[in-house]
């Protein structure tokens, strides 16, 4: 399959930055609480919870911490008030940015997100103004060093399970799926004992935009940094070709 992937540039992965600051477990804990509230504590019957558990393991969260989080959420369902919100906006030179957040105070989050755009000389847009520029895809990243299979064998497992595309990068493999097929592919890889660096449904830009103006780059980076530093922000997607 074609090696077209630019996954390192697709999404500023908040979890990588937050891991260094000790925040990732708190973020995942929120996601566990919401997933349990929406679909129950059994990951076999709760697609979202299974995704969060995969993310937790990829970030080295201990199994007992995951289990405690699930049990706590199951016994505290009525007090889980977090909700998902999405914002769309423009960075310098029209760079498209989509922000996913999980918050217990939408007014606070909206204010912080708006401020991040403004400080980087960007602006918030209306819902739907940019989402058509991205494709929603299941995306699984596999570390070559952690995987014992060769590329051909791994590709066949993924494609047989319903994957749309497979790409080999310098130090990793990427599997792309339709969102509806994501869980089938993830389970197929998991059953083969294949370690996944990340496994999630994400937004992939259809086209990328290159910035050459240093001021524009500085302003865009400011916006992205402010968004990633916000505890409510779960993911930031953009079409900047870094």
Language-model-detected regions and their locations in the chain:
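N-terminal cationic and glycine-rich segments that engage phosphates or anionic surfaces
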Residues: 1-125, 130-141, 238-241
């Amino acid at each position: 399959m074609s090696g077209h992937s630019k996954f390192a540039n697709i999404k500023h992965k908040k979890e990588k930055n937050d891991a260094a600051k000790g925040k990732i477990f708190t973020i995942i804990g929120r996601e566990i609480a919401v997933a349990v509230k929406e679909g129950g504590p059994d990951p076999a019957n709760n697609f979202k919870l299974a995704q969060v558990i995969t993310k937790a393991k990829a970030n080295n969260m201990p199994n007992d911490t995951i289990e405690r989080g699930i049990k706590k959420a199951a016994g505290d369902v009525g007090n889980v008030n977090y909700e998902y919100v999405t914002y769309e906006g423009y960075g310098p030179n029209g760079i498209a940015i989509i922000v996913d957040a999980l918050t217990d105070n939408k007014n606070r989050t909206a204010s912080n997100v708006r401020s991040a755009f403004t400080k980087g000389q960007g602006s918030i847009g209306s819902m739907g103004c940019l989402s058509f520029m991205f494709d929603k895809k299941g995306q699984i990243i596999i570390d070559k060093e952690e995987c014992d299979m060769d590329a051909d064998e791994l590709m066949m497992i993924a494609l047989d399970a319903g994957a749309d595309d497979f790409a080999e990068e310098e130090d990793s493999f990427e599997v792309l799926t339709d969102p509806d097929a994501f869980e089938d592919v993830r389970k197929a890889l998991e059953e083969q004992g294949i370690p996944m660096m990340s496994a999630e449904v994400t937004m992939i830009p259809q086209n990328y935009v290159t910035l050459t103006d240093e001021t524009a780059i500085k302003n865009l980076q400011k916006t992205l940094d402010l968004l990633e530093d916000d505890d409510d922000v779960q993911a930031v997607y953009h079409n900047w070709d870094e």
